[in-house]
Amino acid sequence: MALKFELLKTHKNARRGRIYLPHGVVETPTFMPVGTNANVKLMTPENLEEIGAQIILANAFHLYLKPGMEVLRHHNGIHDFMNWEKPILTDSGGFQVFSLRKGRKITKEGVLIKSPLDGSMRMITPELSMEIQNSIGSDIVMAFDYCAEPGISHQDAVVALELTTLWAERSLKSIRNMSDQSIFGIVQGAFYKDLRERSAKEITSMDFDGFAIGGLSVGEGYDITLEMTEFTVPLLPENKPRYFMGAGAPRLIVDLVNLGVDIFDSVLPTRVARHGQALTWKGKMNVRAAKYKFDKSPIDDECTCYTCRNYSRSYIRHLFDRGEVLGQMLLTIHNLHFMMDLSKKIRESIDGGYFEKLRGEVLKYYD
C-alpha cells in the first residue's frame, strides 16, 4: 500500500506528523537507526523494539551483494529474513555513487561501480535498484540518485542533477510497474541554490509519496548544511513527508526539525558508541576517560535504557579498556535509546508548543 501521511500539528516550521505504512505507524519527527546489512550493528530486533525504534534503514546495494535477491525473495523479503516486524526504508544505492567513487563510471544508463566485497564491477541502474528494493520488500523505497561530492563545479552539478531527474523518472515508473511500495524522490543540486530550486521543481512534479533532501551532510560546513536545507524545505509539498538523508548529531536534528524536516538517519550514534562515546542530555561523554574508573553512576542519570538501568560508567570503561565487545553493545543500546528519547521529546515539545525551549537545551550541550 502507498503510505498515508497526516500532518497533526505545527509549531512555527516544526512539524508533528504520522506516517501509515504496511508494517506499522511512524510518529514524526523521528530518527531511523541504520541497518545497512539487515542488522543494526550490535543490536538485536528485540533491542531495537525495547529502545522504541519505529523504523530502520537498510541499504539496497549492500544487500544486493550479500545475501542477494534470491535469498531475500526466498524469505519473502527482509522483514522475515531479519525478524523485524516494523517498517523499513531502503537507500537506493545512490549514496554508494558518492562513497565508492574510485573507479566508477557514470552514464545515463546508470553507474558502473566496484564491489567493496570482491572488487568486481557492477552496473547499477534505476531499474535494477527498484528490483533490488522490491526483493527486499521495504515499506519505503528511495529513487536512484546521483549524490555529488563536495566541491563539485556548477557545470558538473548540473550533470548530476539531470541524471538524478532522469533516474527519478525511471525509478518511479519501474517500481509502479512491479509493486505498490511507497517511493520517495530525492532533491539534489549540490551547494547551488539555483540547482536546488530546479531539482526540487523537477522532483516534486512527479508522483512520489515523499521527498528527501540529499547531497548534504557529506563534509561541507554546518552553516552550509542549514542554509541549503532552509532554502530547500519550502520548495517541498507540505502534505508529504520530508526526509533529510544523513543526520545523526543531536544539534543537527533539532536544527533540521526547526526548519520543517520529519525524518533522519545516520550511522553516527552507533559508530561513536563503538569508539566509547556516549550521547547524553548533558552532551557527549568519553566513557574511556580515566576519571570514570571508580564512577558507580550510570552513563546518564536521566536515561531509562537497559544500559543505564543495569551498569555503571566504571564497568563500561573497564569493558572498553579490555576490548570487550559487550562495552560497544551497551553503549550502542544507550546511544540509540537516547536518539529515540530525543525524537519522542521533540514530538512532545511540538505538541506542547515548547519546541524552542527543548531545542535551546540541546544546543546548550551540543555545539
From Swiss-Prot:
Q: What Enzyme Commission number(s) appear in the record?
A: 2.4.2.29
Per the record, the domain of life is Bacteria
Cofactor binding: number and manner: Binds 1 zinc ion per subunit.
The molecular function terms in GO held by this entry are: metal ion binding; tRNA-guanosine(34) queuine transglycosylase activity
Biological pathway = tRNA modification; tRNA-queuosine biosynthesis
Keyword annotations from UniProtKB, A to Z: Glycosyltransferase, Metal-binding, Queuosine biosynthesis, Transferase, tRNA processing, Zinc
Q: Where is this region: RNA binding?
A: 270-274
Q: Which InterPro entries match?
A: ArchSynthase1/Queuine_TRR, TGT, TGT-like_sf, tRNA_ribo_trans-like
Q: Name one GO biological process term.
A: tRNA-guanine transglycosylation
Q: Which residues bind Zn(2+)?
A: C303, C305, C308, H334
- What is the annotated role of this protein in its UniProt record? Catalyzes the base-exchange of a guanine (G) residue with the queuine precursor 7-aminomethyl-7-deazaguanine (PreQ1) at position 34 (anticodon wobble position) in tRNAs with GU(N) anticodons (tRNA-Asp, -Asn, -His and -Tyr). Catalysis occurs through a double-displacement mechanism. The nucleophile active site attacks the C1' of nucleotide 34 to detach the guanine base from the RNA, forming a covalent enzyme-RNA intermediate. The proton acceptor active site deprotonates the incoming PreQ1, allowing a nucleophilic attack on the C1' of the ribose to form the product.
What is the name of this protein? Queuine tRNA-ribosyltransferase
**Lineage in the entry?**
Bacteria, Thermotogati, Thermotogota, Thermotogae, Thermotogales
